[in-house]
Amino acid sequence: MSQDYRSITELPDSLLNTEQLMRLSHRYLLGARLVTAKRVLEVACGAGAGLGLLAQSVQQLVAADYSLSVLQMAQAHYTRRYPLVCGDASWLPFPAAAFDVICCFEALYYLPDYNHFLRESRRILTSGGTLLLSVSNPDWRYFVPGLLTTHYPTAPALAQSLLNAGFTDLQLFGILPSSAASPLTRLRHHLRRWVLQANPSIATGVFAQTLKRLLYSRLLPMPAELTPHAAAAMGGEVKMTPLPLDRPDTVHRVLYVLCSAGSSAEACEANP
């Protein structure tokens, strides 16, 4: 890949609406519950807003991102607290069985072929290690694809890809159901979808901030590092609904998948 993702990356001091901050906080609160005394890798870490939360109880934390300029922002904030690696998620520069947990949040659909990343994740995870993914749901009724994205997997397609890559014990969850949204929130979703379908380029830069102000009015700056207190206040009450793996979900805006790396023998059977 040679794409520059800085324009679509949430950076420190970017203005976010409350739902964006909630999603950001929730994903790292969830990740933090899985990483105690583990060797952890976050892939597509961006500017590293969640690294402090993940690092509270880990044995080791490494973060990787494709964009050097974005990774340098994380480096400027964290200095040498954690190893930061610039690399391609499709070809991860780590030895086999190097990590116990891998987290990748809302990034699969920027990859030319996310199956390469899944196979690489299986390779560098220990047997029984954990992969935690979050993805925007393409079957959600207000879904609009983002700029620079390639392919959004549906829940069944992602589940099958994970099985093919050698993962087991798959669990699928949804958050932010449209059925629970207020009439005003649903109106905002309709307007956002209409505007972005008419002009996708408005999703970046000054246009994006203007759109957010028009739709949401109250915007807050993204922190360089989420604190436990702030994250709990913004994302601690999110309900995760278990979902079936074999059919699309049209209700939830975001999907989470939690799964385990199968044994080497199982991985070979999945990829004969």
Language model features: what each stretch is:
Residues 1-91, 118, 238, 248-272:
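Conserved N-terminal segment of class I S-adenosyl-L-methionine
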Residues 177-272:
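A C-terminal cap/extension of S-adenosyl-L-methionine-dependent methyltransferases
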Residues 103:
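A conserved beta-strand element that flanks and buttresses the S-adenosyl-L-methionine
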Residues 106-110:
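Short catalytic micro-motifs in class I SAM-dependent methyltransferases
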Residues 142-161, 179:
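Acceptor-substrate binding/catalytic loop of class I
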Residues 167-178:
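Conserved S-adenosyl-L-methionine
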Residues 115-127:
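A short glycine-rich, Lys/Arg-flanked "PGG" loop and its adjoining helix->strand segment in the class I
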Residues 129-135:
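Conserved beta-strand signature within the Rossmann-like core of class I S-adenosyl-L-methionine
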